[in-house]
Amino acid sequence: MQLAAIIVSLVLTVVGVALIARAIGQFVRYFRLGQPVPAGTRTDNPYQRSVTLVKEFLGHTRMNRWGIVGVAHWFVAIGFLTLPPTLAQAYGQLFEADWVLPVLGGFLPFEMYIEFIGVMTVIGIAVLMVIRLLNLPSRAGRKSRFTGSTAWQAYFVEYVILTIGLAIYVLRGLEGALHHVESYEAAYFASYPLVLAFKGLSVGVLQNLVYFVAMIKISTSLIWMITVSLNIDMGVAWHRFLAFPNIWFKREADGGTALGALQPMTSGGKPIDFTDPGDDDVFGVSQVEQFSWKGLLDFSTCTECGRCQSQCPAWNTGKPLSPKLLIMSLRDHAHAKAPYLLAGGGKTMEGEEKASEEQLA
């Protein structure tokens, strides 16, 4: 069991790391296709921007407006950030079943934190899954905020999180049994029932179970990594990474809503002088590459949650307009067009093809 678990886990790790590195490179090239923004408009006051990022993430200031959905999502988000140490623990357990993290392993506050977050992540994702199932488009039609969203991606992400959360919980129970936890204690305050359930098993069986569950945990994480790396337009997964720069680069450094006076129209990152416009100035957007890099980042960060759609008067009165579907369409078009643009393709202002036949071959 141990050898199989090691081989499967390490093979998936090599593939996953290679693909995620490639995906990061694709994102960098993709965002560079966007137009620049006026100098300093997205990078002014870096301290305040960093404060806003921490406040909006830890406080979930936007999500918590949605009640139980916001609370459940907060625990899932914190659980995702807690994944690295638990993943490191699982890798160590592939080689030594009773292995613990250096320094943190056995540190009571950390052990209690893992217990608490592990359970709350499972509860949080279960709540979100139930909410999704109760609001399926097949049940509620247009009233469902999930109408038009890519269902398989959401289900995939939800079941991955659930599987990883359960694996952490089961591993905690196995660890307690292997470490001979004889009575209820704070370090296993949530997983102690599993410690009792595994207590009568032999050391050999416990070790094989640790190898197996650690493999499940690692494999699930790496399968998720491989899947999202092959689908860089999968906003429901990639927002876990892209949301951080998206918040930091908000229009207002203090996190204020981007309302008020219309921003000056720009071309190539510079305001257009309408009294004497440049010959190559582009007014507005007629091609997806004419959006700014921040616009492309916005498209890719969309989670397809449908909250904007649920608030849209046009959508709610039976019209085809939906802000969610608009953003999704722009995202999909931008990602589909990116290879062509990166190969040198595109149109001049006169409508002529920029790339040669050799470049597009």
PLM region descriptions:
Residues 1-285, 324, 328-333:
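Membrane-embedded alpha-helical bundles of multi-pass integral membrane proteins
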Residues 126, 302-308, 312:
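The canonical Cys-X-X-Cys-His
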